[in-house]
Amino acid sequence: MKTLILLIQFFTRIPIPIAINMDEVNLKKGSALLPFVGLIIGAWNWLVFTLVALVMPLPVAIIAGLFAEIIITGGFHVDALADTADGLFSSRKKERMLEIMKDSRVGANGVIAICFYFLFYGALFLSVPSAYEIGWLFFVLPIVAKGVTMLLFAKMTYAGSNEGLGSIFLGVPWWPIAISQLFVLFILGLVFSYIGLLAYAGVILFTIIYRTFVYKRIGGMNGDTLGAGGQMGQLVCLFCLVLVWGLI
């Protein structure tokens, strides 16, 4: 329970007034609960979307659902997406890329990445067959994002100094990763049947490609690339679901 509270405090802005000492060993073992944090975020997103959809047009409800995640997470991983885009697409050497990611200012690549991320997200949501399924997507996608993050923890090499937030998860054992993937697959299968499982296969393929690209650019992962991977992973899952729905 302490590990779950610590993960909630780490990845969200949910106010839990309990001071817990950072135990990296137990945090790594308890990282199997990370998709459950995604479930909490997803439940909040679903609630906001559903309530707004009762009184407002669907596009407005979709925007509200997207904004709900920014509220509960503080835009933690959206900021990581911007930093990652600024760094990896700066055409600089590895050391300079890492410096750019640490810079609190957002560059042109970061702004472009965020704009197209949300435009693509909104367009895909509007392509979903029904509002009922959109609600379920708001619930499921944050779970997928945390599943992708867990995959990126596997045999992770940390880029730069080991003082960043992401370095806490260096050396996560294989079994929390396996448990997290089973949980994600269970939720996707329960909600979307075999279509959800097919979509996650696409997510796994994306994760492999993304990991390979990042390692070639900066030699490993850091907090920004981990967060960006989760954000893009849920977008890829949504894309795959819409693609399969369009084919069947």
Curated annotation (Swiss-Prot):
Keywords for this protein: Cell membrane, Cobalamin biosynthesis, Magnesium, Membrane, Transferase, Transmembrane, Transmembrane helix
Keyword Ribonucleoprotein assigned: no
Gene Ontology biological-process entries: cobalamin biosynthetic process
Keyword hit for Nucleotidyltransferase: no
Designated gene of the protein: cobS
Top EC class, one word: transferase
EC number: 2.7.8.26
UniProt family annotation: Belongs to the CobS family.
A GO CC annotation given for this chain: plasma membrane
Disulfide partners: none
InterPro entries: CobS
Membrane topology: Multi-pass membrane protein
TM ranges: 24-44, 47-67, 70-90, 106-126, 134-154, 165-185, 186-206, 228-248
GO terms of molecular function: adenosylcobinamide-GDP ribazoletransferase activity; cobalamin 5'-phosphate synthase activity
Cofactor: Mg(2+)
Reaction(s) catalysed (UniProt annotation): alpha-ribazole + adenosylcob(III)inamide-GDP = adenosylcob(III)alamin + GMP + H(+); alpha-ribazole 5'-phosphate + adenosylcob(III)inamide-GDP = adenosylcob(III)alamin 5'-phosphate + GMP + H(+)
Compartment(s) where it occurs, according to its Swiss-Prot or TrEMBL record: Cell membrane
Organism, as annotated: Listeria welshimeri serovar 6b (strain ATCC 35897 / DSM 20650 / CCUG 15529 / CIP 8149 / NCTC 11857 / SLCC 5334 / V8)
Protein name: Adenosylcobinamide-GDP ribazoletransferase
Pathway recorded for this protein: Cofactor biosynthesis; adenosylcobalamin biosynthesis; adenosylcobalamin from cob(II)yrinate a,c-diamide: step 7/7
Function: Joins adenosylcobinamide-GDP and alpha-ribazole to generate adenosylcobalamin (Ado-cobalamin). Also synthesizes adenosylcobalamin 5'-phosphate from adenosylcobinamide-GDP and alpha-ribazole 5'-phosphate.
